[in-house]
């Protein structure tokens, strides 16, 4: 799970808790809109922080170097994705990328993604879901396809 420039501490805290529950690594890519020690971030994650496998990358370039060395496909979640997250075939080692609450994934990084997916909206007037909700939806679908959910 990769968050690019997250801005809202409670969203990141909720995502950290979801990652802890699923034993999923959480990669935060700076700059962040808050300090890692932010009380709202900690509060949202409650007492689950010891279970979070957290990695911090100062810049997008730093993350890209790490991701290339580690292998796996970069899957960008964006409202302009090329296919529905439900129709996509996830593989072990995929990196699920989510952008900031206000700007999404930067265009230059989105262009480097191996694939892009979107979460369908029934109401055209609603542009997107909350970041922590979107992450949970994408993560649980990938885990379901990979056989981690029974």
Residue ranges of predicted features:
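Post-transcriptional modification and biogenesis factors for structured RNAs
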Residues: 1-150
């Amino acid at each position: 799970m990769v968050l690019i420039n997250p801005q809202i501490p409670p969203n990141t805290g909720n995502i950290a808790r979801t990652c802890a529950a699923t034993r999923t690594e959480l990669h935060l890519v700076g700059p962040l809109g808050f300090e890692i020690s932010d009380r709202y971030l900690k509060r949202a994650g409650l007492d689950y922080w010891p279970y979070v496998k957290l990695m911090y990358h100062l810049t997008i370039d730093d993350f890209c170097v790490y991701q290339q060395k580690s292998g796996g496909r970069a899957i960008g979640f964006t409202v302009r994705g090329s296919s529905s997250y439900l129709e996509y075939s996830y593989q072990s080692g995929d990196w699920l990328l989510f952008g900031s609450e206000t700007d999404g994934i930067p265009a230059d990084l989105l262009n480097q993604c191996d694939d892009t997916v979107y979460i369908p909206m029934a109401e055209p007037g609603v542009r997107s879901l909350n970041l922590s909700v979107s992450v949970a939806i994408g993560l649980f679908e990938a885990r379901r396809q990979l056989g981690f959910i029974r």
